[in-house]
């Protein structure tokens, strides 16, 4: 059916969430969808619970598809809170991670410290992502759209390769989403128009959010927190191979 694929592969960034996938599951997933994403986040603090050989083997497998891997922000925040940042960087390097997420979703990091850690991550050779937003919806709602814009641009100036807009796994009542998971269009537009689009990644766990971001911004919009069994689904949305985007791109 290749002759029906008018758009073809989309050059973009897609981040997938690994919540506890076994090695064989990852093998099968990559066989089917390994060409459709390039960032893999081990969810929350799950990496602490795995045998380290499993982590090393999975990282090697992901890397064979040119997919960057990282632990997500929770372990970074724990390390920073416990003054164990050097140990953290050494450990992720030892286990084969090649990317880092700098965040303060559950803790507080002042702007100077944040910039310093972004710079440190870059100096150590890691692909560096940073995240804007709080895990607690009430605290997250205290950010104005302009503050989010300023934080994004500040992180990019500090050296962040990609800035993630917090959306959590639920995609509700957080960031650019209301309590029903609908996109707040004015916020979306303001952020998009005042930041480098190629360096902003929107967490969009729900299909309706993926559709709206693709149709509103473009099919190469950077998207994250994609469920591992919905990678191909997202790719069809990007290519206009599903009813939601068919004939609309």
Segments from the language model and where they lie:
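Active-site-adjacent beta->alpha loops and helix N-cap segments on the catalytic face
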Residues: 24, 48-61, 78-87, 104-127, ...
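C-terminal alpha-helical cap/extension of soluble enzyme domains
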Residues: 187-249
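Conserved N-terminal beta1-alpha1 strand-loop-helix module at the mouth
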Residues: 1-59
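Conserved anion-binding
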Residues: 99-173
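Active-site-proximal loop/turn and secondary-structure-junction residues that shape catalytic pockets
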Residues: 19-21, 44-48, 73-77, 104-108, ...
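Active-site mouth loops of central-metabolism enzymes
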Residues: 9-24, 43-47, 70-84, 132-147
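Catalytic cores of alpha/beta
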Residues: 31, 84-90, 146-157, 205-219
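Hydrophobic faces of well-ordered beta-strands that scaffold small-molecule active sites
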Residues: 11-18, 37-42, 69-73, 100-102, ...
């Amino acid at each position: 059916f290749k002759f029906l694929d008018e758009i073809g592969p989309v050059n973009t960034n897609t981040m997938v969430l690994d919540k506890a996938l076994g090695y064989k599951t990852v093998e099968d997933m990559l066989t089917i969808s390994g060409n459709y994403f390039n960032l893999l986040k081990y969810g929350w603090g799950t990496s602490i619970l795995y045998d380290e050989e499993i982590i090393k083997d999975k990282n090697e497998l992901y890397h064979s598809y040119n997919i960057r891997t990282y632990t997500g922000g929770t372990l970074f925040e724990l390390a920073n809170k416990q003054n164990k940042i050097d140990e953290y960087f050494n450990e992720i390097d030892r286990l084969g991670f090649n990317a880092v997420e700098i965040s303060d979703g559950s803790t507080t990091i002042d702007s100077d410290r944040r910039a310093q850690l972004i710079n440190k991550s870059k100096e150590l050779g890691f692909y560096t992502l940073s995240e804007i937003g709080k895990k607690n919806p009430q605290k997250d709602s205290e950010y104005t759209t302009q503050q989010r814009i300023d934080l994004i641009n500040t992180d990019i100036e500090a050296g962040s390769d990609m800035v993630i807009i917090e959306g959590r796994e639920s995609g509700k009542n957080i960031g650019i989403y209301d309590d029903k998971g609908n996109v707040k269009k004015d916020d979306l537009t303001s952020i998009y128009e005042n930041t480098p689009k190629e360096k902003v990644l929107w967490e969009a766990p729900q299909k309706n959010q993926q559709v709206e971001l693709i149709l509103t911004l473009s099919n190469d919009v950077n998207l994250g927190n994609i469920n591992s069994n919905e990678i191909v689904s997202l790719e069809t949305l990007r290519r206009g191979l599903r009813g939601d985007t068919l004939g609309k791109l």
